[in-house]
C-alpha cells in the first residue's frame, strides 16, 4: 500500500511540476528571496540591537534563490522531457526519477531543511526584539533597528507562517483523500 501512495504522490507532483502555471508561480516566488537578499545587503549595518536580522534576510535570500532556481530548472527540464513525449511506464525502472537522481533529491532536501531551521532562527532573532526603536535613541545609540529592515523581516516571517500553514492543511487534505480512496477501494 505505501508503494501505491508513493506512486500516486509522484504522479501528482509530476503533473503539477510540468504545468506552465507552476513555472510562472515559481518565477513570482523568486521575487521574495531576491528582495530578501537586497534588503539584507542594503541594511546590513542598520540594526545594532539585533545584527542577525539583516544576516537572516541575506542568507535566507541567497539560499532561497538557489532553492527556487533549482526548482525552476527541474520543472523546465520535466516540461522539456514531456514535450519530447518521454513516457514513464509502470514497468519502467525510471518510475521514480528522484531515485535515479539521488544527489538532486538530497540537495533539495538539505536546502529545505536548512531553510526551515533558518526560518526558526529568524523567528527568534526578529521577535526577540519585537518593535525596537526605529531611530537611534540619544542615550543608547546602539538600541535601534531600521524600520524598513525590521518590518520587512516581520512581513517575510508572516508570509512564511501563512505558506507553512497552507502547506500543512493541503498535505492533511491530500492524506485524508488518499485514506478515503484506499478505504473505498477496499470496499
Swiss-Prot record:
The keyword Transmembrane helix applies. The chain crosses the membrane at residues 21-41, 52-72, 107-127, 149-169. One of its GO terms (cellular component) is membrane. InterPro entries: TMEM272. Keywords: Membrane, Transmembrane, Transmembrane helix. It is found in: Membrane. The keyword Kinase does not apply. It is a multi-pass membrane protein. This is Transmembrane protein 272. It comes from Homo sapiens (Human).
Amino acid at each position: 500500500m505505501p508503494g501505491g501512495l508513493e506512486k500516486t504522490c509522484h504522479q501528482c507532483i509530476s503533473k503539477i511540476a510540468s504545468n506552465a502555471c507552476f513555472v510562472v508561480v515559481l518565477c513570482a516566488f523568486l521575487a521574495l528571496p531576491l528582495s530578501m537578499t537586497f534588503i539584507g545587503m542594503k541594511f546590513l549595518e542598520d540594526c545594532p540591537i539585533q545584527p542577525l536580522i539583516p544576516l537572516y534576510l541575506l542568507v535566507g535570500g541567497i539560499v532561497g534563490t538557489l532553492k527556487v532556481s533549482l526548482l525552476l530548472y527541474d520543472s523546465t527540464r520535466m516540461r522539456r522531457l514531456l514535450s519530447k513525449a518521454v513516457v514513464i511506464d509502470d514497468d519502467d525502472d525510471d518510475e521514480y526519477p528522484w531515485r535515479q537522481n539521488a544527489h538532486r533529491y538530497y540537495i533539495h532536501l538539505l536546502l529545505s531543511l536548512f531553510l526551515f531551521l533558518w526560518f526558526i532562527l529568524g523567528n527568534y532573532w526578529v521577535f526577540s526584539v519585537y518593535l525596537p526603536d526605529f531611530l537611534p535613541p540619544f542615550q543608547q545609540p546602539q538600541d535601534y533597528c531600521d524600520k524598513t529592515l525590521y518590518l520587512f523581516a516581520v512581513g517575510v516571517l508572516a508570509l512564511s507562517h501563512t505558506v507553512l500553514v497552507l502547506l500543512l492543511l493541503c498535505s492533511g487534505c491530500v492524506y485524508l483523500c488518499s485514506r478515503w480512496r484506499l478505504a473505498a477501494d477496499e470496499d
